[in-house]
Regions:
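Metal-dependent nucleotidyltransferase catalytic core
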Residues: 39-72
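Short, charge-rich binding segments
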Residues: 29-30, 37-40, 68-70, 83-88
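Short, conserved acidic/polar surface loops in the N-terminal third of protein domains
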Residues: 25-28, 48-51, 105-108
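Catalytic cores of NTP-dependent nucleotidyl/adenyl transfer enzymes across multiple folds
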Residues: 1, 70-177
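Active-site nucleotide-donor binding segment shared across nucleotidyl transfer reactions
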Residues: 3-35, 39-41
Length: 177
């Protein structure tokens, strides 16, 4: 899929967010329709994204312009493809955040899981460990800083973060991070 494609084209990134739990947890508990990555500021991702769009059988891709509330550079892409299961067009989103790595622990994980279809030789991605992802998820509950404001129609987003926190608390092994 998309994660495999952006890895195969050599795009330098850190895979984060709820979707990376599909690789970090032995048994994934929920699906997500977006891939969140971090790249270093100044990285020209346009050619990587265009080349990746030709690897997996995407029928279309487009950049979606969204206004952010802060000065952090972000870019968003929508990749459309025909589902091999339903034979209907569906999409996956690529959310790119331009910032330096602030994670204490990064690990390499193979793109492999019972819910993912991959082809050819194994592909690995760099991702924060479970402890760091838990820290990210907890920021969702800091609505006056980086989190999701409560009571503004984002209840489902808050519930997803809470669900992930419950899963991660059962898995973490470093309470000092």
């Amino acid at each position: 899929g998309l994660l495999e494609a952006i890895s195969r084209v050599g795009m330098p990134f850190i895979f984060k967010g709820g979707t990376c739990l599909m690789l970090l947890l032995e048994r994934p508990q929920r699906l997500s329709t977006d891939i969140d990555i971090i790249v270093k500021p100044g990285t020209d991702i346009s050619k990587y994204v265009e080349t990746a769009s030709k690897i997996f059988p995407f029928t279309d891709y487009e950049e979606q312009i969204r206004k952010g509330k802060n000065n952090i550079e972000k870019r968003h892409f929508k990749f459309t493809y025909v589902s091999p299961i339903t034979n209907r067009e569906i999409y996956i989103l690529l959310d790119v955040l331009f910032e330096e790595n602030n994670y204490a622990n990064l690990i390499k994980k193979e793109i492999k899981n019972d819910l993912l279809i991959t082809e050819g030789e194994k592909v690995e991605v760099t991702t924060p460990d479970l402890n760091c992802i838990l820290g990210d998820k907890l920021t969702a509950f800091a609505p006056h800083t980086t989190g999701i404001p409560l009571g503004v129609g984002k209840d489902v987003e808050v519930l997803k973060q809470m669900y992930d926190v419950v899963l991660l608390i059962q898995e973490i092994d470093n309470f000092e991070l």
